[in-house]
From Swiss-Prot:
Belongs to the IF-3 family. This is Translation initiation factor IF-3. NCBIfam families: infC (TIGR00168). The lineage of its organism: Bacteria, Bacillati, Bacillota, Bacilli, Lactobacillales. Monomer. It is found in: Cytoplasm. GO terms for biological process: ribosome disassembly. IF-3 binds to the 30S ribosomal subunit and shifts the equilibrium between 70S ribosomes and their 50S and 30S subunits in favor of the free subunits, thus enhancing the availability of 30S subunits on which protein synthesis initiation begins. GO terms for molecular function: ribosome binding; translation initiation factor activity. It comes from Lactococcus lactis subsp. lactis (strain IL1403) (Streptococcus lactis). Keywords: Cytoplasm, Initiation factor, Protein biosynthesis. GO terms for cellular component: cytosol; membrane.
């Protein structure tokens, strides 16, 4: 069985314009933003055509609000606003640094430098220690390593989540200090 598709169906993301507006009357706003009152849709379309512009449905109230404007310019401005809003959103990712409960000092320093680099870039850092075999019985050693790591990064980071066990792993969450 084939599905019927409505060819005349308007894309929901784009506002309805010109002939796609099915209301009998619209509350009309002029090209300069002035209120022109409630007018029949056919008359509003003629006014828009006389100005070589489009009639765009702004709000679907009772009666619907339509504005005479240049549709391509309107869509360009909308896309521009969306891009600006997207730029202003801060993208924070979580980077992971894996340690061992019996980590050597040189390895610890390397992981510390790596974590500081992530924090300075503005990313959060998740520090994890995996306990293998019988090391699970020495969780205090892992907690000491975590505390040492948190202490070493206190100038560039704040502890967002204290060290806690989850199965055979211990986690610590660090967030960059806001400037």
């Amino acid at each position: 069985m084939r599905r019927r598709t409505n060819i005349a169906k308007q894309d929901n993301r784009k506002p309805m314009m010109n002939g796609a507006i099915r209301a009998r009357e619209v509350r009309l706003i002029g090209a300069e933003g002035e209120q022109l009152g409630v007018t029949p849709t056919s008359e509003a379309l003629m006014q828009a055509e006389n100005l070589n512009m489009d009639l765009v449905l702004i709000s679907n109230q009772e009666p619907p609000v339509a504005k005479i404007m240049d549709y391509t310019k309107f869509m360009f401005e909308q896309k521009k606003k969306q891009k600006e809003a997207k730029k202003k959103q801060a993208v924070v990712s979580v980077k992971e640094v894996r340690l061992s409960p019996v980590i050597d000092q040189n390895d610890f320093d390397t992981k510390l430098r790596q974590a500081i680099k992530f924090l300075e870039k503005g990313d959060k850092v998740k520090v994890s220690i995996r306990f293998k075999g019988r090391m699970i019985t020495h969780q205090d050693v892992g907690r000491q390593v975590m505390d040492k790591f948190a202490q070493a990064t206190k100038e560039v980071a704040v502890v967002e989540q204290r060290a806690k066990m989850d199965g055979r792993q211990m986690f610590l969450q660090l967030a960059p200090i806001k400037k």
